[in-house]
Amino acid sequence: MSLEVGKKALDFLVKNSGARHNLEVDFFGGEPLMNFDVVKELVTYGRSLEEKYDKKFRFTLTTNGVLLNDDILEYANKEMSNLVLSIDGRKEIHDLMRPFRGGQGSYDVVADKFKKAADSRNQMNYYVRGTFTHNNLDFSEDVKHLARSMYLSISFARLLR
């Protein structure tokens, strides 16, 4: 998403929010960290709209974690009310569902980053989002794995085909 489109979306939200004071914006899809400079500019723009229109934005960032680093995490902890970490369960399932271009799995790249992210938020205001598909009909095993290995808050999303 371009900065211009993002600003228009925030303007539309404010214009159509009526008397509602609290507004929610979730950066997700297409991996927002690939366009993180625009995300930051939109948060700054949203903060300026708060003052101008007496609104309060709650921003959420959803990420697959591949590009997550200390600088992004520090920013997210300051500006994002919630952080959603998208992982598809235990290593063999996640690697099957989310390989890199060369076929290598991504679990080992993101698992430690997600643990660090959860710890940096004091185990609060973050969520783990897994995906239930035909490849993991035993998704309860993935939930147990995530709960045991690093996470407290787990949400479910159904992928329809």
Where are the predicted features?
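Radical SAM/AdoMet-radical enzyme domain recognition
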Residues: 3-26, 35-159
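Short acidic donor-binding/metal-coordinating loop in glycosyltransferase active sites
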Residues: 29-30
